[in-house]
UniProtKB/Swiss-Prot annotation:
Keyword Chaperone recorded: yes
Entry keyword rRNA-binding: no
Pfam families recorded: HSCB_C (PF07743)
Gene Ontology terms describing biological process: [2Fe-2S] cluster assembly; protein complex oligomerization; protein folding
Protein name: Co-chaperone protein HscB homolog
Ranges where the J domain occurs: 8-80
Source organism of the structure: Aromatoleum aromaticum (strain DSM 19018 / LMG 30748 / EbN1)
Quaternary organization: Interacts with HscA and stimulates its ATPase activity.
Similarity comment: family membership: Belongs to the HscB family.
Keywords, sorted A to Z: Chaperone
InterPro entries reported for this sequence: DnaJ_domain, HscB, HscB_C_sf, HscB_oligo_C, J_dom_sf
Cited function: Co-chaperone involved in the maturation of iron-sulfur cluster-containing proteins. Seems to help targeting proteins to be folded toward HscA.
Gene Ontology MF, one: protein-folding chaperone binding
Amino acid sequence: MSIDLQQDFFALFGLPRRFRVDEAALEMAYHDLQGQVHPDRFAHLPDVEKRLSMQWATRVNEGFRTLRKPLPRAQYMLELAGVDAGLHTNTAMSSAFLMEQMEWREAVEEARAAGEGHELTQLHHRLRHHAREVFDELERTIDERHDFAAAAEIVRRLMFMEKIQHEIDDALEALET
């Protein structure tokens, strides 16, 4: 068995380096690799081999977690492209997007304050639909235009949207208790 711990996750799973991932192929490759590197297969071997299998298993799990979800996958692709997305330091966004975020937050807060579970659920659905549209834009930006600087801005937008999604989930949970 030979797994190169230095290869990127796409190469590890035998996938092309694209934002759109064949989820079935990823899943199949993951299970195949897990079968090859599972620590139980190395239990009878010397400690060095056991540690190596643990490293391999960890790398496979990390790769799978990264590639199976669109936002971590996009962040990883930016990293591979050498683009510093400034995910935690660069919060500069267009004024239109910032206005949209304020409107989302106000709507969430109003629904939360009024105890409107139905309205929060509607906001949840609208935000998920909007996020799908933005993910489609991200896919085109990465896979077709190969514009990683623009992709970094889209990733930051999606991170804002993810925060609002969590706020809606928290508000719904608070109403249920």
